Amino acid sequence: MSERIVLHIGAMKTGTTFLQTTLERNSALLSEAGVDFTGNRFAYQTRAVSAALKGAGEKGRRYRRWRRLARAARQSEQDVSLVSMEFLSFAEDPQIRQLLKPLRGLQVDIVMTVRDQFLVAPAQWQTHCRNNGTSDWGTYLRQIEPRLAGRPRRNDAYRTFHRAQDVDRTLQRWATFRRVGDVHVITVPGRDAPQDELWKRFFDVVGVTPPPVDFGVAAPNTSLGYGSCDLLRRLNEHLGDVSGGRYRKGMRQLAREVLAQRRDLESRPVLDRRGAEYARGLNEQLRESITRNGYVLHGSLDDLPVPASLEEYDAKPVPVPELETRAAAEAAWDYLTDRAGAKGGKRPTSLDALVLEDARLLREVHGWS
């Protein structure tokens, strides 16, 4: 039976999808290496964690799925059980206490993957655009800065960014519990690193030789270009009444089947100098936190750069090229008119009218009244 469980608690936008997909699709190889990816499915772990973190409902019922997961981990014939679910980083003290209870008797180690904040901010803006957000890139950069977030009520962009990326606070919350053993931090290697480097670092934490897997089957998050993200946030201005689950299903389909195909045709949002100063400061805070608290580091602090000069960054954010947004909106219109069986219509000429028509077609195709 397992005597140790490793909880990979995030953070978001740090290679979690790559790791989770690879773990799930190679669960048999993991078993041969002495590792149990508990439940063998990421969806199983997601449901257990999501139910436990819900604010409403009777406490015992909320944690029922998590207790089942804990029981499965205990009963595993492997040496180590492994759970990877970034929503665990959202848990507050009372929730962490409840999550740890059924793991009593197991060695519980925590691991968090962290990434260069110069890359995280654009990735988080994309998440903002794909989840009802309406802020353009330049506005978003200012909104996530604490000094301009507003008091006493901070904006949604600020809340979601810092909820996902406040690594120091997250690790300190978990580390204060006596049932937590070692706390590990993995720095995500740079873009030029070998494809398997993050995998190797992850299995340094697990404590076994990483099994040889086919990374070709791993499914990283489908990233979008600048114009497509701008289209989504413009569409969101007309879809604020669509409920979360229905919204996500329809918009993910549009992103996957249409907008992701345009990625190589579009530019990327780039930090301005002030945004770069903020990212540099966040990297510096991460480095200090890892060193100060004595977390077990896998990788290098150099993966969290603190450049002396930021002269390469423009004074103001580079706006999205309107032609990119228009081309993305036209591609969406072609796709949606085909889905709606409305071929032969005339495409609107102005960008605002085209976005409005795309929003109307989304409602028609998905039954969003």
Regions found by a protein language model. Give the residues of each.
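Anion-recognition interface
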Residues: M1-S369
